[in-house]
């Protein structure tokens, strides 16, 4: 509905603050979808989404991560540059889904802002060293590594330190997580 009438956008933005979960998360999902199709319409609200990174509701934080990554391609004012460290600081979060959201959205940022590709690469290579927690196990780390390889594949042409990425990927070929091993093998067939 908002896609047909962007005058409704302020109401959807307000809905993210609703005390009712269904409204709050429904509105956030609408905004996430809109950010993919019409990032230019949401870009004037970039500060709103940046503030959502600090939400008490993890789901809103995850939505904000995706939205911000989608807005990177229209970020003429370089607002993302000011929050790069904050955004990628979530790689140290105790929750696997939070870390996976950063990793999964990283390629969008690297492609939208090629001058960040090396720094994004460095951040993604750090996933090897994230700490385990009750919400981020060794198996979770393997899932995150798989997401990192998929992200690298999307912007590999922009990466200067290709050998470091290849080494990272090679270290996962024999992973006990079958899909990680397969993803690593496919990456190496394509890029090595």
Please identify what each model-predicted range represents.
Residues 57-105:
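Hydrophobic, well-structured mid-protein blocks that either form specific transmembrane helices
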């Amino acid at each position: 509905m908002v896609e047909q009438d962007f005058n409704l956008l302020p109401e959807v933005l307000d809905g993210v603050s609703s005390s009712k979960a269904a409204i709050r998360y429904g509105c956030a999902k609408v905004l996430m979808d809109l950010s993919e199709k019409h990032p230019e319409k949401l870009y004037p609200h970039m500060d709103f989404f940046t503030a959502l990174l600090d939400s008490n509701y993890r789901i809103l934080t995850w939505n904000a991560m995706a939205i911000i990554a989608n807005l990177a391609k229209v970020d003429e004012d370089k607002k993302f540059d000011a929050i790069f460290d904050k955004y990628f600081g979530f790689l140290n979060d105790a929750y696997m889904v939070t870390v996976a959201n950063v990793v999964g959205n990283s390629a969008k940022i690297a492609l939208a802002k090629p001058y960040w590709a090396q720094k994004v690469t460095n951040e993604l290579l750090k996933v090897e060293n994230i700490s385990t927690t009750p919400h981020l196990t060794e198996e979770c780390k393997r899932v995150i590594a798989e997401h990192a390889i998929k992200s690298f594949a999307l912007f590999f042409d922009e990466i200067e330190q290709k050998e470091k990425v290849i080494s990272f990927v090679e270290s996962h070929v024999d992973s006990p997580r079958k899909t990680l091993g397969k993803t690593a093998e496919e990456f190496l067939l394509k890029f090595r």
